[in-house]
Amino acid sequence: MSRYRGPRFKKIRRLGALPGLTSKRPKAGSDLRNQSRSVKKSQYRIRLEEKQKLRFHYGLTEHQLLKYVRIAGKAKGSTGQVLLQLLEMRLDNILFRLGMALTIPQARQLVNHGHILVNGRIVDIPSYRCKPRDIITVKDEQNSRTLVQNLLDSSAPEELPNHLTLHTFQYEGLVNQIIDRKCVGLKINELLVVEYYSRQT
């Protein structure tokens, strides 16, 4: 199954805010309407919607998300928390959380087009897994820096999560540590996602 490229507002109206997909938010009152409908939802649908939230927020295909779930299941610790850490430490998401892109798809384009370096080397793989002490920089070329500067200027000022540091004037971000669960930028019940996949096998 490919990445979703359809109307974004349609998704947030059904699933709630998906900041990685779009900066738009559901209209006031839509949460109440969704809650009134949720009384009739089956447990399967609740798990499915949590899975879809995760998939659309991070811009993954079904195959990619399943792969991450399997990796998380083999790791030590809570499968759900490890899953979120894996997704949050992707390079495209790190750029998004640093404010260098307004959405994760936009961050993915920056990476694909060779605008981003990790530890001094161009990385053009959006799924690259960042590690503590990684230094993310924008390529030292005018078009790359102008592009990112415009995005930084356009992004709404938000407090950075504690696992990241941004040096705006150097066009540089630093990964301080693996992200804490409380700093994940999406309202999600990751256990329901894990449960969804465990029931599919």
Swiss-Prot record:
Keywords tagged on the record: Chloroplast, Plastid, Ribonucleoprotein, Ribosomal protein, RNA-binding, rRNA-binding
Gene Ontology, cellular component aspect: chloroplast; chloroplast stroma; plastid; small ribosomal subunit
Gene3D superfamilies recorded: Ribosomal Protein S4 Delta 41, Chain A, domain 1, RNA-binding S4 domain
GO biological process: translation
Pfam families: Ribosomal_S4, S4
GO MF term list: mRNA binding; rRNA binding; structural constituent of ribosome
Places the protein is found: Plastid, Chloroplast
Location of the S4 RNA-binding domain: 89-152
Keyword Phosphoprotein: no
InterPro entries with a match to the protein in the record: Ribosomal_uS4, Ribosomal_uS4_bac-type, Ribosomal_uS4_CS, Ribosomal_uS4_N, S4_RNA-bd, S4_RNA-bd_sf
Organism domain of life: Eukaryota
Disulfide bridge positions per record: none
UniProt subunit comment: Part of the 30S ribosomal subunit. Contacts protein S5. The interaction surface between S4 and S5 is involved in control of translational fidelity.
UniProt family annotation: Belongs to the universal ribosomal protein uS4 family.
Record function comment: One of the primary rRNA binding proteins, it binds directly to 16S rRNA where it nucleates assembly of the body of the 30S subunit. With S5 and S12 plays an important role in translational accuracy.
Name this polypeptide is given: Small ribosomal subunit protein uS4c
Annotated organism of origin: Arabidopsis thaliana (Mouse-ear cress)
Gene encoding the protein: rps4
